[in-house]
């Protein structure tokens, strides 16, 4: 007799015995049968070991609840009017409901805005939509990530949102060591049983902003200041540059300066250098909105990865491109709460609403909104792919053949700049003893944590 047949036979015997004990007396008296309550238990083999399926999951089955003889306070049997022992069903322990708390790990300061500002918008939405408590630690170095996770876990967090691609590898390692914690990691990388990674096609809206920059420049020289550690930084810069070339073609002249987001002095030097080169429009891709404010102080037109451009540079902004993290993070965290978490390494685009565009400033050149909306709509409908050849790099080498389009996976791996980038400069400096996080836990929100409606 096979093991499975024996198990099935044993389970059936238990069910029949319980049924006889509980309902047959009622049947003899002509009364309706009593419904036997059931409980879910693991199936075991003859030695008492749990039986698993092909996926390694324990096989479960339903069996009747056990009956227990009722006794009084002194332990004496309780009998009915006929002198028969009274029985009752066993009580099952109430299933404990997990209380979730979400902790965010920032590589910069929340007050810096830009990417961190977009995550703060999402953090606020998580509270509004799911009613969950959230908190964060900020200015966390890559080497401090494990300690930041431990700090948040000690504070009750069992969902950790890693807010920088710099942490991708660290989040993956922590996920393997923390089976009681879920990780949601910004920066498309590996997934795991308790790890989801996500990103987006920010180069799409950067491409539209490139067209806007070309329409608004008078000097025909456009600057870019970027942090080398930003998500898909070459893809975003190249997407912007290709947008410039849509209007300016061979005349496109773009200058790129690198600076770290946590150094105001580097940012100022990089922006000043771009202005000295004749750039009258500057695009910023950093983890801080300081370049936007500095450009406004210098009375230079500016575009950046900030959702709140009208607030921080009302007279100087042209537009902005930014991540809308709210919908995805709320959906993923809801799936964790509802116990149907399914990590898939999500990447959102314009069509999904993951990447968005700031409404164009009324002070922009006439026609900016119209010409850019046409390109935006084409991209949103899937009719215009940003990285379609022929595309050459700064050395004149063909990187994308004519008529061919790069896949999202290949765009993520770009480590070159397009031919319209005429000059680059680096203002980054190595710091021997960088100042990291003090691991203070915060939960307060800034005044502005609502992203603008889609234009």
Predicted regions and their residues:
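Bacterial signal peptide processing site
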Residues: 28-30
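A residue-level marker of the well-folded mature domains of exported/periplasmic proteins
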Residues: 33, 56, 72-455
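Disulfide-bonded cysteine-rich modules in secreted/extracellular proteins
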Residues: 35-45, 66-76
